[in-house]
Amino acid sequence: MACGSVDPHGLLSSPLASARLNSLPYMEGPWIWSCGQTNITCKVVNGKAVEVGKWPWQVSILFLGMYICSGSLIHHHWILTAAHCLQRSKNPAKYTVKVGVQTLPDNSTSELLVTRIVIHENFINRMSDDIAILKLKYPVTWSPLVQPICLPSFNLKPSIGTMCWVVGWGLEKAEGHPKTPYSVQGLAVRIVNNEICNHRYQFLLLKNQKKFIGNDMLCTSSEWGLDTCQDTSGSSLVCQMNKTWVQMGVVSWNFDCGRRQFPSVYTSTSHFTQWIKRQIGDLKFTSMAVPSFLSPFILTGYILLVSLGSLWLL
């Protein structure tokens, strides 16, 4: 670990371990123009050395100036989050976004204005289609602390048992005692089979309902008795492959924070790749020249959104 810090739970011991995914990505160009890249440095915060730049796509979403949810940068203009985070109001003027935030509360960065809210048209409760995007009034400028995350293509799925990371500022619960972290952090989790997840949540089934966890969801569990809690809504579930981070999920819901027998549930981003693409339809999508030895199958790895000549690796 960097910065000489100690990790008693061993959660951060292997942040660069690649995820096992069904296809491989390809990307060229410098990291500053790429997605899913990090530039980790050390900084003294409140007298303690902490890592900064580890999760540069992470943003905080505010309602009337108060933090309510997390989100992730997928483009100069666009933020990905959970639909249930935006139920307080459909008026974009009431929401703002902060990028490059390392600790909460934060008074060092400016609030960015939101001009448009797009909630999935099928979202009617917190259980399914829990995805939304926000459009910023002005494009953000990339820096070592502000970078976009990659999105998966439709057929990109993490294998069962893959270790991924949940990123956010929300509540964490260990050994029955909740605590509030103020620095953005990652929690190591493993992908759980949806059928097992369904079995754990079968008591929630309604009459004539055959399953609760749909194809638009992913489930994870933690081996350390830690888990995501209510204040992590909208946070990113990211997996790393070939040193590139890909957002595979958006924190949606769970049953009672920290209960290991109940997996955390996420919106599967790969399920909504085409939906996101349709919402950002005013952009021009172009392809990238690639080495001849790469097959088209390899190009189905992830999406990189760039404002000029937007690139979708599909």
From Swiss-Prot:
Record-level Gene Ontology MF annotations: serine-type endopeptidase activity
Alphabetized Pfam families for the sequence: Trypsin (PF00089)
Domain Peptidase S1: start-end pairs: 44-281
Active-site residues, record numbering mapped to chain: 84 (charge relay system), 130 (charge relay system), 233 (charge relay system)
Enzyme class: hydrolase
GO cellular component: membrane
UniProt topology in membrane: Single-pass membrane protein
Localisation: Membrane
InterPro entries: Peptidase_S1_PA, Peptidase_S1_PA_chymotrypsin, Peptidase_S1A, Ser/Thr_Proteases_Immune/Dev, Trypsin_dom, TRYPSIN_HIS
CDD domains recorded: Tryp_SPc (cd00190)
GO annotation, biological process: proteolysis
EC number(s) given by UniProt: 3.4.21.-
Disulfide partners: 69-85, 164-239, 197-219, 229-257
Keywords (A to Z) from UniProt: Disulfide bond, Hydrolase, Membrane, Protease, Serine protease, Transmembrane, Transmembrane helix
Transmembrane region(s): 293-313
Major location (coarse): membrane
Signal peptide start and end residues: none
Family: Belongs to the peptidase S1 family.
Protein's name according to its UniProt entry: Serine protease 46
Naturally occurring in which organism (per UniProt): Mus musculus (Mouse)
Name of the coding gene: Prss46
